Amino acid sequence: MSAPLPASLAVEFCGLKLASPIVLLSGCVGFGEEYTRVEGFSNTDVGAIVLKGTTREPRLGNPPHRVYETPMGMLNAIGLQNPGVDKVVDEILPSLDFSETRFIANVCGSTIEDYVETTRRFEDSPIDAIEINISCPNIKE
């Protein structure tokens, strides 16, 4: 006798249909490829993956030490380290399997023009949605 199949966890958020209400937030799994390296997990386990914060130009991020372990978890101050939107769109996105889950870009900038230009680069990409990051506390600008 086989176990009954679980009920669907599908949800709709802002017109975007997700197979599950579980969304991996920006930075948790980099640009998505890290998640599939964890044994027993796949992109189909989540409704969406929000990519690591992406800026118009590459950023080195903050100098070390950027991660601090606490008794209740960890704190980080990565500083939006990323290869820049051109590399994300041209090299990283083509390596992701968009048939398995939804992908949401996290767009960061220092000026309105940065946000506009970074968002424009995602227009013709397979990204399902864009999240605007206006609150990263780990950068000086």
Which residues does each PLM region occupy?
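N-terminal capping/small domains of soluble enzymes
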Residues: 1-103, 108-110
